[in-house]
Amino acid sequence: FLAETDIGRIEAHGHAAGQPFQQAAIDLGLLDPETAGIILAMQGGFPLLAAGDQRVDPLVVSAFDPADAYAAKVRTIRAKMRAAAKDSDGAALRLAILSIDAGDEAAILAANLAVVMAQMDGQTMLVDVDIDRPSLDRLFRVANKAGLAEQLLGSAALLPAARTAVDGLWLMTAGRASGSASSLVTKGPLADTAAGWGLHDTSMLFYLAQRRGEQTPFGSILAGFDAVTIVARRGETAIADMRRVIDDLDRHNISIAGSVIA
């Protein structure tokens, strides 16, 4: 359903931008993210898990069924985040999902987005920054032994990242809850911390969460990130909290790709 002239345009754009065919087509507006993802899956462009595979929670639907409506929504979010990060190196983006009192829905979104990134962009690292209430380890059924907390405290001999059952996706769990580790998160840009991990060709997605009554300095924490998507919960997230976070991100020139109301 693409004309030969369009295919030529896509190939030229992909070559110039260093992008795969599907992403180049999305950038040019010739394919929407939903169609591109389904085509890629049908072509065997990325492996899927069989229904009932116990290695990943079924809530991470993108790992099982790219045609699912939720998976399509997640691909659209990915496309918006990549568009917001258009001035960055598309091969190794630093993205974040930021939950403002949004509950489990935000963690589920982050897990699905990481899967879609691994499927469409290649090697991806998902990092659980919610040290006080980790959740991504349960969704990917990875033991939360050593993780970000140990990495920040300098007690990890090796980078504490675990391979998930999803091809190309690694998970750095939150690690064991520690007040000192939690305070370290707020003291410096995570982008600078991640730069020291040596994963120059790996895209990264960080999951962060703020709960009612907290005033986390997300602007300084996420300085240097390519794009952020905010997740709020209808009827739960206070408008004042959301406004404060948005203003803080704006002060640090952090690109906000959009917001999701769970």
Where are these regions (language model features)?
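Phosphate-binding loop that captures ATP/GTP phosphates
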Residues: 86, 115-175, 194, 239
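Extended, non-globular alpha-helical segments
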Residues: 55-89, 149-150, 154-165, 175
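Conserved catalytic-core segment of NTP-binding enzymes
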Residues: 182-262
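Walker A/P-loop phosphate-binding motif and the immediately C-terminal alpha-helix
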Residues: 62-140, 225
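Non-catalytic accessory regions
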Residues: 1-57
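C-terminal lobe/tail of nucleotide-utilizing enzymes
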Residues: 48-77, 184, 242-262
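Signal for well-folded cores of large energy- and translation-related assemblies
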Residues: 26, 41, 78-86, 118, ...
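Helical mechanochemical/support elements of P-loop NTPase systems and associated helical scaffolds
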Residues: 6, 17, 21, 32, ...
